[in-house]
């Protein structure tokens, strides 16, 4: 009886310990604004400006994407590096290239290429989203 009670008490913990579902599958099916909004409500996606506002990106719906919180942190680190290079005069141009899989509205990766008119790319980083 004690063992049955212990199992009954532990059951919710065991269920809660199940691994998270494969998010890539969810993002592949995130092909509508409603699907993206549902993932954002659950905290699986957060808003990002593809061309960072900090370096002159427009606060415009066409500049918005939805990424994982981890990808947002990576993108912020890239933005910080770009800002430092801009302040040092080492770059004067930024190209942001989001890549999508299928009909998903969530980019699978975002590539940032910062260059200077006098030479090759000074920064070429890819943020993997999913």
Each model region followed by its residue ranges:
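Domain-level detector of nuclease and nuclease-like folds
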Residues: 24-130
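Sec-dependent N-terminal signal peptides
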Residues: 4-14
């Amino acid at each position: 009886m004690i063992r049955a009670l212990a199992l009954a008490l532990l059951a919710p913990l065991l269920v809660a310990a199940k691994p998270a579902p494969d998010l890539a599958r969810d993002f592949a099916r995130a092909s509508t604004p409603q699907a993206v909004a549902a993932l954002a409500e659950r905290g699986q996606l957060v808003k990002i400006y593809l061309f960072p506002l900090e370096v002159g990106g427009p606060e415009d719906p066409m500049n918005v994407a939805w990424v994982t919180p981890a990808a947002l942190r990576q993108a912020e680190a890239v933005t910080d590096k770009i800002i430092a290079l801009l302040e040092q005069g080492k770059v004067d141009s930024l190209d942001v290239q989001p890549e999508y899989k299928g009909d998903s509205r969530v980019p699978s990766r975002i590539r940032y290429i910062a260059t200077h008119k006098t030479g090759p790319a000074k920064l070429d980083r890819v943020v993997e989203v999913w």
